[in-house]
A protein has these predicted regions:
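Residue-level signal for alpha-helical context at structural boundaries
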Residues: 65, 84, 91-92, 203, ...
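Alpha-helical solenoid scaffolds that mediate protein-protein interactions
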Residues: 54, 66, 73, 80-81, ...
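Long, hydrophobic/aromatic-enriched structural stretches that serve as scaffold segments
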Residues: 22-85
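Residue-level detector of alpha-helical recognition elements and their boundaries
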Residues: 12, 62, 69, 88-89, ...
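Secondary-shell segments that build the walls of catalytic and ion/ligand-binding clefts
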Residues: 1-32, 100-261
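Amphipathic alpha-helical scaffolding segments
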Residues: 68-76, 97, 209-215
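Internal, hydrophobic cores of structured domains that mediate oligomerization or house catalytic pockets
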Residues: 71, 77-120
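Short, glycine/acidic-rich hinge or "gate" loops at secondary-structure transitions
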Residues: 66, 86-97, 243-250
C-alpha cells in the first residue's frame, strides 16, 4: 500500500472508532474496567500521535528517524496488547493499576536516580550516596519511603519488561501461530533499538538499505506494521466497556475489516 492509501485506511478506521466511542458515551455505558480504559485510551492516543509523525517523516524518506518512532510504536503496542491479554484472563484492573501507578513511580525514581548520580559527579563524591536517604531528604512528604517500597515497585513492574510481556502473550494465546508472530518481532524491536541508542549497527543498516536502493521499500513496510499496531491498540480500548456482545462484535469486525491489507 502507498502512504496515501494507508492514510485513507487510517482515517476510515479512526472515524468508525470515534463513532463507536460516541455511541458508548451517549448511552452512558458502564466502564467495566475504568483503569484499563484510562490506560489503554492514553496508550492508543500516544500511538496515534507517534504514527502520524511516522507517516510524515517516512514520506520525506527519513529512515533513521522513522526507525526510532517505529521502535516506540512496537513497545507501546506490546504494552497495550499485554494489558488487554491480562484483562481477558484476570477480569480486574490490577495490571492496569500497576502500569498507571507503579510503572510511573519507577520512571520517576529513575529520573531522581539520575539527579543523584549527577550530584555525586559534580561534587566528586567517591562513594555512591544512599538513594533512599536522598529521596527522603529531597522530598519530606516521602519520609516513610524505604527499600521495601522500592522492592514492591520493582516486583510490580517486572511484567512490563518486553521479553516478559511477549512470553505472557505467547502463552495466553490459543492460536500459537499468532503467538509465534509476536515472538518473531523481538529481533525487529532489538534492531530498531540500535537507532534509539545511536549505535553503529543503525548506521550500517541505513547504508546497506541505501546501497540496495531499498529505503522506500523498508519505510513502506515499517509504516504498514505501525498502522496495524495503532489500529489494534485502539480497538482494544473498546474491550474495557460493558457492551452487548453483538454490538462489540459488529464494531470490532468492521474495524478489523478496514485495517486489512
Amino acid at each position: 500500500l502507498t502512504y496515501e492509501q494507508i492514510k485513507q485506511k487510517y482515517e476510515a478506521h479512526s472515524n468508525l472508532y470515534e463513532r463507536a466511542i460516541e455511541i458508548i458515551k451517549n448511552n452512558d455505558l458502564i466502564k467495566e474496567f475504568p483503569i484499563y480504559y484510562e490506560v489503554l485510551t492514553d496508550c492508543s492516543e500516544r500511538l496515534e500521535q507517534i504514527f502520524k509523525s511516522l507517516l510524515l517523516i517516512s514520506e520525506e524518506g527519513k529512515i533513521y528517524s522513522a526507525q526510532i518512532l517505529y521502535r516506540a510504536i512496537i513497545e507501546l503496542f506490546f504494552k497495550t496488547f499485554f494489558l488487554t491479554s491480562k484483562l481477558s484472563t484476570d477480569k480486574n484492573d490490577e495490571s492496569a493499576e500497576h502500569f498507571k501507578v507503579h510503572l510511573m513511580l519507577s520512571e520517576w525514581l529513575a529520573e531522581q536516580m539520575g539527579y543523584l548520580e549527577m550530584t555525586d559527579l559534580i561534587n566528586d563524591i567517591e562513594n555512591k550516596s544512599d538513594f533512599v536517604q536522598f529521596i527522603r531528604d529531597k522530598f519530606p512528604e516521602l519520609k516513610e519511603f524505604d527499600k521495601e517500597n522500592q522492592k514492591e515497585i520493582s516486583n510490580a513492574i517486572k511484567k512490563f519488561n518486553i521479553k516478559n510481556m511477549i512470553a505472557y502473550i505467547r502463552e495466553s494465546l490459543t492460536d500459537k501461530e499468532i503467538g509465534n508472530y509476536f515472538t518473531k518481532i523481538l529481533p525487529e524491536y532489538s534492531r530498531a533499538s540500535s537507532f534509539v541508542h545511536g549505535g553503529p549497527y543503525a548506521t550500517y543498516i541505513v547504508k546497506n538499505l541505501k546501497d540496495k536502493g531499498q529505503i522506500e521499500k523498508e519505510l513502506e513496510r515499517v509504516v504498514g506494521v505501525a498502522f496495524s499496531c495503532t489500529c489494534v491498540a485502539k480497538e482494544n480500548c473498546l474491550l474495557s466497556f460493558k457492551l452487548h456482545p453483538d454490538d462489540m462484535k459488529d464494531f470490532i469486525n468492521e474495524l478489523r475489516e478496514i485495517r486489512k491489507f
